């Protein structure tokens, strides 16, 4: 009998493609405990040329951030039993230099305080985007980040 060939090729071929993509596309960590928001942000990011990885909890995000040097991060400030500020402290302990886009339902004062905390931790918050997410605005910020990443990647 004939084996049907997957249109993606073998699992080994697919892994090779994904490994190559990891070196040519910026990696984005999407931290949001809301499944729908996380999925939407991942899709917008993929369309903007990122390789997104979603984390539904503080623990999952902390593990991913420790295992992978992400080029960019989106962070919800409310992560169930943890605050986004706890994630900022964790990212700082890891020495993360990834630009951060805060995506939150919190008010302006909370966003402003988050930026101050991030600055004290030597983290780089690019923007605070309110929920519900304006997809055009999100894509605009991601495209700016990708252009910045491309400039750095070409210079390296």
Regions found by a protein language model. Give the residues of each.
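Non-catalytic signal-transmission and effector/linker regions of two-component phosphorelay proteins
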Residues: 1-29, 42, 136-156
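The feature encodes the CheY-like receiver
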Residues: 80
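Short hydrophobic/Thr-rich beta-strand motif most characteristic of the beta2 strand and flanking loop
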Residues: 49-57, 64, 129
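Active-site residues of response regulator receiver
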Residues: 76
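Two-component/phosphorelay signaling modules centered on CheY-like receiver
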Residues: 20, 35-53
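Acidic catalytic/metal-coordinating carboxylates
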Residues: 57, 83-86
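Alpha4 helix (beta4-alpha4-beta5 surface) of REC/receiver domains from two-component response regulators
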Residues: 86, 106-128
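Conserved acidic carboxylate
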Residues: 32
């Amino acid at each position: 009998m004939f084996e049907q060939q997957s249109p993606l090729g073998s699992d080994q071929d697919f892994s090779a493609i994904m490994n190559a993509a990891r070196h040519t596309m910026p990696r984005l960590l999407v931290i949001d405990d809301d499944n729908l928001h996380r999925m939407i942000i991942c899709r917008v990011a993929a369309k903007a040329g990122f390789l997104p990885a979603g984390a539904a909890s503080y623990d999952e995000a902390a593990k991913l951030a420790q295992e992978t040097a992400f080029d960019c991060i989106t962070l919800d400030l409310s992560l169930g039993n943890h605050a986004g500020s706890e994630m900022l402290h964790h990212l700082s302990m890891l020495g993360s230099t990834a630009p951060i886009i805060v995506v939150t339902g919190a008010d302006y004062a909370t966003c402003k305080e988050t930026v101050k905390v991030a600055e004290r931790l030597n983290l780089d918050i690019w923007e605070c985007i309110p929920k519900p997410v304006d997809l055009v605005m999100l894509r605009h910020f991601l495209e700016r980040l990708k252009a910045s990443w491309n400039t750095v990647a070409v210079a390296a």
